[in-house]
Amino acid sequence: MAVVKVAAIQAKPVGNDLTHPGNVKHALELLRKCVQMDDEVRVACFPEYFPWSGREELAREAEEFGIYVIAGIAERENGALYNSCILFGPDGSILGRQRKLSLGSMERKYFGFTPGRELRVFDTEFGRIGIGVCADLWGPPNVGRQLLMLGAELIFNPSFFFVLRDVWHCLLLARAVELMVPIVAVDTAEFPFRLGDRVFRECGGLTCIVGPPWRDMEEFASWWHGARFNWFLGWLGTEEGILIRELDLDRAREFRKAWFSRIVGRENPWVAEEAARG
């Protein structure tokens, strides 16, 4: 059975600075705390941009604890700077990276990031992981669909919200229902974010895990006929913290099949559309 425990680490940047060198040490401390809280955690995810650097240190820590780690790293390649989320394997290797596709004006102007070019999914022993970096997932609807077409069974959404924070949960809920895939959405803790001469104070927080809430197909059927269920499987406030939940990907797959079969008459409409295009 594909059951996996995931941890969403809502980290506060050292000195209220996303690029602070001390973020690496803080990330390692939070990883250790995460494993101490629950040694059955298999995937730990940090927010977008966090800890900004520290690939070697994170790889060593992932290997020491034998877990998957997703971390926000600013990567330079061939003269270009990318907003990357790197997936470290439990053996300390880099299994892959997802570079953000949809860059806002802040990222282009202040950080000088270059957009990524492709979406990927990553195989693990419990299922395929997809990563939609911040607006890539909750903004353009095609990204979530493409991840599903690539076989994603669990989607992580490392994010950094210094605007639009209050609508994030609405957008995540829409994606979770549309795709019928569990989403682990991770923001920084709240801190005053300085951007040029401006300071954004309602910045960060509200990390959550959202996904199919039913325990069995009987509950799914009751929801279909009007029963109410809370899709938010857990959430944090604005302080630094760690959210841990167990997700059953086999059960989610069963619900997904039933959902698409009922609303469009086939298991995955986007896969069918892509096949029809040839």
Label each region the model flagged.
Residues 11, 49, 136-137, 160-161, ...:
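Active-site metal-binding loops of divalent metal-dependent hydrolases
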Residues 3-20, 45, 128-136, 156:
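Active-site-proximal beta-strand elements of phosphoester/diester hydrolases
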Residues 121, 189-278:
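C-terminal beta-strand edge segments of enzyme domains
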Residues 76-153, 159-174, 203, 224-231, ...:
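Active-site catalytic loop in hydrolytic enzyme cores
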Residues 5, 70, 84, 118, ...:
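Conserved beta-strand and immediately adjacent loop positions that scaffold enzyme active sites
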Residues 14, 18-99, 161-181:
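Cys-nucleophile CN-hydrolase/nitrilase-fold catalytic domain and related Cys-dependent amidase chemistry
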Residues 8, 87, 97, 119-121, ...:
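Conserved hydrophobic/aromatic beta-strand scaffold that supports enzyme active sites
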